[in-house]
Design a protein with these regions (language model features):
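Membrane-interface anchor segments at the N-terminal boundary of transmembrane helices
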Residues: 100, 306-372, 382
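Membrane-proximal lumenal/periplasmic loop motifs of glycosylation machinery
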Residues: 40-53, 57, 64-84, 92-93, ...
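Membrane-interface transmembrane helices that cradle and orient dolichyl/undecaprenyl
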Residues: 126-127, 162-187, 195, 213-219, ...
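Transmembrane-helix motifs of polytopic, lipid-linked glycan transferases
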Residues: 103-124, 157, 161-165, 353-357
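Short helix- or helix-capping micro-motifs
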Residues: 23-26, 132-140, 144, 164, ...
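Transmembrane-helix signature of polytopic, membrane-embedded enzymes
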Residues: 116-138, 156-157, 179, 368-372
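Membrane-embedded glycan-lipid processing machinery
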Residues: 75, 79, 90, 97-107, ...
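Membrane-proximal stem/loop segments at transmembrane-domain junctions that anchor or position
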Residues: 247-324
Length: 419
């Protein structure tokens, strides 16, 4: 490497370290603020009630070496284990200190900023990666969700890891050794499985993105088939322990959870609005009458029957869900403060705007487009059926920031030339 190239690399590394330091400080400050707020009477675990309490209780059961189940009758396959395992690690180290857990999650959120840089460097160059990392470091929604007891940020971290391995698998890099490429495909599949154990939807979205990238990549048809096979093998191996456990517990082969049915019915039922309202689970009391597997299937049947009988209502609900998914301001009632909504709006609007510009600039780079927008668009498709929220878009904004960085960099270059 020439001296100028070495100096540029050193400068880029310093900028990255500074960016990550800022990201960590921002998140730790927010951890203090959020902890102070939730400690106020009536004290609670998280700003957004619901999922956090379940995750925390599952983690407590893991630490105590008890059944991975919550509620009565016990629901053994309600959640995938990825996020509860991370919470259990924190509880094992720091006890029930929620603030310490927020600090650990802040570190994971900071690491996700670093992975965004890595993805940008792999797809474009170091400068683009740095711009994307700066955005993720300062994004108010990304920073805030990093310290909530929710799985979005951990999912973003694992999602980015799997995307990076996919890019390294298919990107032209002079590596022609079949064994090495197959190994990378196996690792990519394993990381897709790991991300699925944090958020089940990645089993479908991640595999589809990987398959499209492999098809679009270089190589013969036989080579691509081998890559796909190794990738799927990696997914299967990484998820096998969870699937076997579920089979032993329920008597059925379940790769993810038995909560898809109730979640689908949440979005497709006579009282649905596009927002989540799971009170029907308590009023129907199906878990007292049927097995967990049967409840999942029953709610799936009810949801699809409602969809078949009410196509117009389903279309209206799909529109409402997309409004919530693509919203530029927070959906949750806890975040209705006008000042917060303005801050989020001013952060999200440039991201989406520059991402559109970056997509236009990258129109002849299909691999870049798939890697940066695939998750965002496929999640949007899923939330035509399931309830919508800005929260579900958040993990996909990390790779999207790379595409936005392409647009930002091009704008700077044009302004520089004009000057």
């Amino acid at each position: 490497m020439c001296r100028s190239g070495l100096l540029e690399t050193v400068a880029a590394n310093r900028c990255l370290l500074f960016t990550l330091a800022v990201a960590l400080v921002v998140r730790l400050v927010l951890a203090v603020v959020i902890q102070h707020r939730v400690d106020q009477p009536p004290s609670r675990l998280c700003l957004i009630a619901g999922d956090a309490e379940g995750y925390w209780e599952l983690a407590q059961h893991l630490v105590a070496m008890e059944d991975f189940a919550i509620y009565e009758p016990p629901r053994y396959v309600l959640r995938v284990p990825g996020f509860p395992v991370v919470l259990a690690m924190s509880q094992a180290l720091f006890g029930s200190n929620v603030f310490a857990t927020r600090c650990l999650l802040a570190c994971i959120g900071t690491a996700a900023c670093g992975l965004t840089y890595w993805l940008g460097r792999e797809l474009v160059d170091e400068t683009t990666g740095l711009i994307a990392a700066v955005y993720t470091a300062l994004s108010p929604t990304m920073a805030l969700f990093s310290v909530l007891i929710l799985s979005e940020t951990l999912f973003a971290f694992t999602l980015l890891l799997s995307l990076i391995t996919m890019v390294r698998l298919v990107w032209p890099n002079g590596t022609n050794a079949t064994g090495r490429v197959m190994g990378r495909a196996l690792v990519a599949g394993g990381l897709i499985g790991l991300a699925t154990l944090v958020r089940p939807t990645w089993l479908y979205v991640g595999v589809l993105i990987a398959a499209v990238m492999i098809v679009l990549g270089a190589g013969t048809r036989r080579f691509k088939i081998l890559c796909l096979a190794c990738m799927l093998l990696g997914v299967g191996l990484s998820m096998a322990p969870w699937a076997v456990r579920n089979s032993l517990v329920t008597g059925h082969l379940v790769f993810t959870t038995l909560w898809a049915g109730p979640s689908l019915y949440d979005g497709l039922n006579p009282q649905a609005t596009g927002d989540s309202d799971m009170r029907f689970v308590e009023t129907d009391r199906l878990f007292e009458q049927l097995s967990e597997y049967e409840v999942d299937r029953e709610y799936s049947r009810r949801a699809w029957r409602f969809a078949a009988e009410n196509p117009g209502r389903v279309l209206w609900l799909a529109w409402k869900k997309q409004q919530r998914y693509w919203s530029l301001v927070p959906n949750a009632d806890q975040f209705r403060d006008v000042r917060l909504q303005v801050v989020v709006f001013l952060a999200v609007l440039p991201l989406l705007g520059f991402a559109i510009y970056g997509a236009w600039l990258s129109q002849h780079k299909p691999l870049t487009l798939v890697a940066t927008t695939g998750a965002l668009l496929l999640f949007a498709g899923l939330h035509l059926l399931f309830v919508g929220s800005l929260r579900y878009r958040l993990p996909a904004e990390y790779p999207l920031s790379v595409l936005a960085a392409v647009g930002v960099r091009q704008l700077f270059l044009r302004l520089k030339r004009a000057a």
